[in-house]
Amino acid sequence: MPAKAQPAGKKGSKKAKAPRPSGGKKRRRRRKESYGIYIYKVLKQVHPDTGISSRAMSIMNSFVNDVFERIAAEASRLAHYNKKSTITSREVQTVVRLLLPGELAKHAVSEGTKAVTKYTTSK
């Protein structure tokens, strides 16, 4: 039996398309959340003419996640010790003083206080 001739517009398709999963809709890829845009904004505030590679951005993102997890874990422990069920800015401030060394802790506390004040006045 001779093979059917292909229409002129469809010569040698590259890949056969697999049928879509049940439901007939295309699966959407889950978004990866990161601090990339915020790291980039801070970089441009500090050094407007400097760029950052994707590898360096990945390292910075890991660093921010690590510091966030350390602060959250220690603040949770502190609240538990004091029989509190809520982590407030006071716990976070105490933890920052514990985790960060000297001058860095002072700057972090002042920036945090400034951010909380700005937030409460904007409400």
Swiss-Prot record:
InterPro entries given in the database record: Histone-fold, Histone_H2A/H2B/H3, Histone_H2B, HISTONE_H2B_site
Cross-linked sites for Glycyl lysine isopeptide (Lys-Gly) (interchain with G-Cter in ubiquitin): K118
Glycosylation sites: S110
Gene3D superfamilies: Histone, subunit A
Classification via Pfam families: Histone
Annotated stretches, region: Disordered: 1-33
CDD domains linked: HFD_H2B (cd22910)
Keywords per UniProt: Chromosome, DNA-binding, Glycoprotein, Isopeptide bond, Nucleosome core, Nucleus, Ubl conjugation
Domain of life: Eukaryota
PROSITE patterns per UniProt: HISTONE_H2B
Places the protein is found: Nucleus; Chromosome
Bias type Low complexity, positions: 1-10
UniProt xrefs under SMART domains: H2B
Biased composition (Basic residues): 11-32
Post-translational changes noted in the entry: Monoubiquitination of Lys-118 gives a specific tag for epigenetic transcriptional activation and is also prerequisite for histone H3 'Lys-4' and 'Lys-79' methylation.
GO CC annotations on file: nucleosome; nucleus
GO molecular function: DNA binding; protein heterodimerization activity; structural constituent of chromatin
Cited function: Core component of nucleosome. Nucleosomes wrap and compact DNA into chromatin, limiting DNA accessibility to the cellular machineries which require DNA as a template. Histones thereby play a central role in transcription regulation, DNA repair, DNA replication and chromosomal stability. DNA accessibility is regulated via a complex set of post-translational modifications of histones, also called histone code, and nucleosome remodeling.
Family statement: Belongs to the histone H2B family.
Oligomer status and interactors: The nucleosome is a histone octamer containing two molecules each of H2A, H2B, H3 and H4 assembled in one H3-H4 heterotetramer and two H2A-H2B heterodimers. The octamer wraps approximately 147 bp of DNA.
Name of the protein in question: Late histone H2B.L1
